[in-house]
């Protein structure tokens, strides 16, 4: 469909509310989330998160948010997008209102610990998927584990 030569694209997802818009991550070099309207007359990659080439951690409005090596992205039944933010060692959520929030993990702190948002630790989470009951599974790469998450 389109060449993403400047992008290290790993994760992709469609939302029910935007069935023709493909969201995808750019890991390693640009640290961003992009979208591509598949019905557009001219296909154009549009950056939707902040910080081209700037790794960081910032929650809030999607267009001002910062990620650090976002790898996989997946949608739930409520049209939230979940992002495995590998470099920040966190799981992030993008709401239908385009707000970004850290739902589990401590930004910049790698480790292994189950627990609440303030105490759970990951080490380079890469893969993420969600089953039909909205259970979230994460490939916690640095800990060599697949983890099932409970997010309220």
Language-model segments: which ranges?
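Short loop/turn segments immediately following the C-termini of beta-strands
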Residues: 27-28, 86-87, 141
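Conserved beta-propeller blade signature
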Residues: 21-24, 80-83, 135-138
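A short loop-to-beta-strand structural motif that recurs across blades of beta-propeller domains
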Residues: 30-34, 89-93, 99, 144-148
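Gly/Pro-rich loop segments of beta-rich domains
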Residues: 1-10, 42-71, 99-126, 152
